[in-house]
């Protein structure tokens, strides 16, 4: 195969080294504090445990 048919893709040096740039938006729609997130998750886990005790599987 002639070398003229082979196309070399130009890859940025940073991506060749395994470095990736992530662009994060600063305008988040919902902001939840980490403490509130932990409290909500504990309440949900407790709710699932209580529901599994009160409602026996068929």
UniProtKB/Swiss-Prot annotation:
Family under the similarity heading: Belongs to the SEC61-beta family.
Transmembrane helix among keywords: yes
Membrane topology, Cytoplasmic segments: 1-33
Protein's cellular compartments: Cell membrane
UniProt xrefs under HAMAP family: SecG
Subunit-level organization: Component of the protein translocase complex. Heterotrimer consisting of alpha (SecY), beta (SecG) and gamma (SecE) subunits. Can form oligomers of the heterotrimer.
Gene Ontology cellular component annotations, sorted alphabetically: plasma membrane
One annotated GO biological process: protein transport
Coiled coil: none
Disulfide-linked positions: none
Regions crossing the membrane: 34-53
Organism, as annotated: Sulfurisphaera tokodaii (strain DSM 16993 / JCM 10545 / NBRC 100140 / 7) (Sulfolobus tokodaii)
Highest taxon in the source lineage: Archaea
Keywords: Cell membrane, Membrane, Protein transport, Translocation, Transmembrane, Transmembrane helix, Transport
Keyword Protein transport belongs to the record: yes
Protein name: Preprotein translocase subunit SecG
Extracellular side: 54-58
Function: Involved in protein export. The function of the beta subunit is unknown, but it may be involved in stabilization of the trimeric complex.
Topology versus the membrane: Single-pass membrane protein
Pfam family, one: Sec61_beta
């Amino acid at each position: 195969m002639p070398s003229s048919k082979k196309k070399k893709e130009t890859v940025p040096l940073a991506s060749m080294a395994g470095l990736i740039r992530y662009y994060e938006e600063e305008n988040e729609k919902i902001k939840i504090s980490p403490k509130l997130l932990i409290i909500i998750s504990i309440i949900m886990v407790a709710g699932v445990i209580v529901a599994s005790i009160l409602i026996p599987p068929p």
